[in-house]
Structure formats: structure tokens, C-alpha cells
Amino acid sequence: MKNSLYQVTDDHPGSNGCAQCGAPDILHGYPTPLCNDCRQGFIRYPIPLGIKVFAGAILLVLIYCCFSFPRDLSLGLHIERGTRAESEKKFLTAQREFTRAASSMPNDVEIQCHLALAAFNNMDLSAFSVIAEKLVGKTIGNDALYKKVDDAMARFNSYVPKDSMIELMKVHRNNIPDPHFKRYLRNHPNDIYAHFSYASILFDQDRFKPCDSILKNVLKIDGGYFPALRLMASLKREMHEYDSADKYCDDLLNINTEAGYAIASKARTRLKQKKDTEALQLALQSIQTDELDPYNKATLILAYHFNGDNEKRDALIEDCRTNDNATTKEFVEYATDVITGKVRFRPK
């Protein structure tokens, strides 16, 4: 008796055997009845060259997708996060995300535009100037984005000295006598940089009323001029106008919700008011928002000091002293002068 696996059975009624050669012994379990030899022949049938080429092309596409998809997904995520952060005025986050996106697509004009806006609103003017130079002569299809970048470029001019101001600084070796400075300001009433520079000198000399007057004039020309808003917050604190000081900090935060220095400025106002617990909370918040700003670190040093946490205060001072940044050293020196009593920060 033959093996039943190779017999034509009632599973294929009316079948005369192998559909290819007619042999009675077929392999069951397949739609087409074939004997073992014919089925093996079909299995070993040569694949046409065209099909091989097509299959190879599909394989290459799949391999490319496997490598490029994670990169493209990452790029898309950075752009999406950066765009969302920009709409929420979280410009530190926006600058971080668009920087990562730009590293993948350095020639993408829209990414560079978003990066420029974030840098400007973070007052990272060195980064902004580099990006702005790249954008000169470029075409931007997004009209709304173009308008924002164009406005930022126009405003950037007020953050650097004009040629006439540079010449005056050269003549007096960066130590312009008061009468000469006043004459220059009268002749250049719209030179925001010069007026702010003079206001800074007045602040350092404790000439608060004329400083206040000049800063208000600056803000009439540009209500969002960051340095003037920041100095106004400090000025009003020194004048004991604490609500007004907070108002200027809020103006900064309305422009950039991640302006950590505005939060730190509020913390210093609370220290002036001897609201030390609230001051510490604000100082910690400023560090959480922007841990790289030395002003925020110096503020936290002061907050630790007035809250009696000398261990954390001294540890942070030591950490800051390892930093070679001149601005960091200047801010920390001020904080240590307050701690030692060399500078009087508030009444005892």
C-alpha cells in the first residue's frame, strides 16, 4: 500500500493527479495538486532579474527609512517643541530646541529665523548678530515670521553704540565727562543706547531721580527695551518703590516668561522688604528657570545668607569662584560685600 499522503483522495474530487505532469502521487495541503518533483521544480524556479532589482530597491528604501526615520522624528520634535515654546514666550526653551534643529538643518531659513527671535528675546545678542548676518539677503516665505525678524533686526541697532557715540568714547577713553555726555544726548535725543548708558552711570552714582527720568524717556521710544526695564526694576527697589519694581519685572516676564533675572530681581526686592522666606523661594525659582545667569546665582547667595543657611551660601560662593567668567565674579563679589557688611543692602 502506498503512503496515503501521496494518494489522490476525495479532498480533490475529479482530480486525475498532478496538474503539471499527471502523476497520481501528489502532495496534499496545497490549493494546486502537484507531485513532489513538480512542486520542488516550481520552488527552485529562477526569479526574473526585474523582480530581483525591484525587491533590492524596496530593501534599500527600507534600510534608508530605518536610519533616517529616527533622525527626522527627532528633528520634527525639536521644531514642534521650539514652536510651542515660542508661542508660550518660553524663549530659553525655544532657543535650545531650535539650536538642536539647526544643527540638523543649518541651511533652513525658517529654523534660523525662529532661532534668531529666541536669541534676541533672551538678550543673547552675540548669537543673534551671527544668525542675523546669515539671514541677510535670504527669502522668507512666512510673512508673519519675516515681520518679527525684521523688527528684531531694526531694534538690535539700539543695543549697540552708533558711530558718533563710538567716536565720543574714543576721544574720552571711555570716560566721557558729564557735560560732554549731556551735550551728546541733547544732540541725539533718539540714541537709546547712549541714553541708557548715561542712566547706568547715574544709577551707579546713586543719582536716582535723573536716572529715573532718562529711563522713562528710553521706554517711551521702545517700551520693550530689556536693559531699561531691568535697570528700572533695580532703581525702583533702591527708591523703595517696591510695587513699581515688581511691575517692571512683570513687564520683562510678559516679554519672556523664562527671564530668570526678572524673578531674581523680585527676590532681591523681597530681601529689601525683609520677606526672606518668599525671597528664597523666588531665588530658587530663578535658578530653576535659568541656572546659567550669574545674577540669579548671586541672588540665591544673598537669599541663603539672609535666611541663615550659611552652609549652602558658602558652597554656592565656592562653586561660583571656580568660574572664570568676569561677570560671574563681579556679581559674586557684590554678594560677598553685602555679607561682610562692606555694602549696605538693607537696614538692620
Please describe what each predicted stretch is:
Residues 87, 121, 155, 204-205, ...:
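Register position in tetratricopeptide repeats
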